[in-house]
Amino acid sequence: QDAFSPQRCPELWTEEFLAGLSARLAPGGRLLTYSRSAAVRASLQRAGLQLYSLLPAPGERVGWSSGTMAVQPGGSCTAEGPGWRPFSPMEKEHLFTRAAVPFRDPDGEASSSEILEKRVLEQQACGLEPTNAWQRRWRGDAALQSR
């Protein structure tokens, strides 16, 4: 894992921090990240940004992405561009799994371990689809399509 990934440095990926970044974007402003975390993407979406998937690099599995582009409404961003595309159905569904439970730090003072521990508790109580069930379903779909 990257030193700045959501699991390593959740302070940079909390719902509150991402909402603050989003609020500072001009109309049409873009935030690009290597992260394809459902928690990060769902937080950006709740902050009012339009989400796009960065195109996969050569060798990456089909149907996934190289990251996320989040755009403040009001600009002239097209649905597809030289390095992005709309979310696939798989990516859209990912936002409704336990993986989409956000990292939270309302006061901006929690440690990494506190943020991660609170998220695990929220995931256990949230009632969303387990992420491993989503993964199995999509792996099964891919296996059927390749036959």
PLM-predicted stretches and their roles:
Residues P27-S35:
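Conserved beta-strand signature within the Rossmann-like core of class I S-adenosyl-L-methionine
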Residues A3, Y34-A38:
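Short strand-turn motif at the edge of the Rossmann-like AdoMet-binding core
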